[in-house]
Amino acid sequence: MTKETKKRIKQRNKLWRVQKNYSSDINYGRYKKVRNEVTELVRRDQDNYRKRLLKSFKGHDKRFYGYIRSLQTRPAGVQQLVDGNGKITETDGEAAELLSKCFQEVYTQEDKKEECPQQWSGKRQRAGEISEEDIDITPEVVERALLRLKEDKSPGPDDLHPMLLRKCASAMAIPLSKIYNKSLNTGTVPKEWKLANVTPLFKKGKKSDPANYRPVSLTSVVCKVMESLVKSKLVEHLEKTGKLSSSQHGFTTGRYCLTNLLEAFENWTTALDEGWGVDVLFLDYRKAFDTVSHSKLMKKLHGCGIVGKLWEWIKDFLTLRKSRVGVRGSFSFWREVLSGVPQGSVLGPLLFLIFVNDLPEWIKSSLKMFADDTKIWARIRVEKDGECLQRDLDSLGRWSDEWLLRFNCEKCKVM
């Protein structure tokens, strides 16, 4: 708001007090004139502010979409829920417990016979592999990571707030670097780092149905800092070795939802201009992040050249995790997390990308992915072209069965 606008607002308020105490047509006319001027000035200042704000979002898609969401009406929190027997929850504690049980039901049951070979945790011996030896966690690196923490974020179950860690970055850097190095070199993660407070976020549908909520984990900020250090080295390794598929646009540097759409749209319009038809299949996986098999993910991590104590550390990071659901300060009982990559963690999205990374190798049709959202398409001129697309869909079905990531048929569409 400009100084001119603030000055006119004070004048408007003064004229209103005069009109209130000495009511007359003249006084009201003076007040009305300034009031209308203030309305125009405020509208002008708001427009200018939005223009400056939108200009600052250039190249920052995440901030832009966050701003758009902030303008929309925020959905209410968890309401009264109804369980499978038609019973309505009466307290926040009951709602938290019901949601916790609902989240537990989607987990993938691991095959006890499917064990990862012990030698995978051995030291790095070949080029194209990465182990704990490639990650040097110095006090300087830790301090820089602590200073990047956002103070407005929430803490995990340990109640160590990011504001505290950021303010004490210089003092915490040395002890934390020692803890991080010991954790990495032993391939173990402290059990306190594997706890999560889960916030249920409503998606769509009936708010009384617990199945219409998704879990987002609030985990230890201390652990998140270490995750960020490990993640940066993993991304560097994957980019250097060319392991990540170019079809993936989710959570990757220089690729976004927009690049995904533009590349697909250009391909489709080019085909149409050349006289082809285009059949597109939009695919979605059911509870994708929560149903990732840990043992199968560890196999894929090894396939990407992740070995040694680093491989063990990620394995320990994923296993024996526990979570509890919170609803307005009331919590459910702690329950073990049997599968999935924790939503809300730093490493989770990257681990999921690695899990679905080989998907394009199973088909011949064109494909684009944004995390778990997948679309495949083919140029159609004769019947056989459609048959090829169907064979690719069947192949993806076999991939789904092998890796235990099931299709959400309700969200799969054909265009």
Where is each model-derived feature located?
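Short, conserved micro-motifs composed of acidic
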Residues: G329, R391, L405-M415
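Short amphipathic alpha-helical coiled-coil/interface segments
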Residues: T5-N13, Y28-Q46, D61, F103, ...
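Active-site palm subdomain of RNA-directed nucleic acid polymerases
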Residues: V230-Q248, P349-W377
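Conserved catalytic palm subdomain of right-hand nucleotidyl-transferase polymerases, strongest
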Residues: D152-L160, D209-L218, T259-H302
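Active-site-proximal segment of RNA-dependent polymerases
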Residues: D111-V142, T188, W193-N197, E236-T291, ...
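Surface-exposed loop/turn segments and immediately adjacent short secondary-structure elements
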Residues: E4, K62-N212, S217, V225, ...
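Catalytic palm subdomain of template-directed nucleic-acid polymerases
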Residues: A288-C304, T374-D401
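Mobile genetic element proteins and their domesticated derivatives, centered on retroelements
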Residues: R12, V38, I68, F103, ...
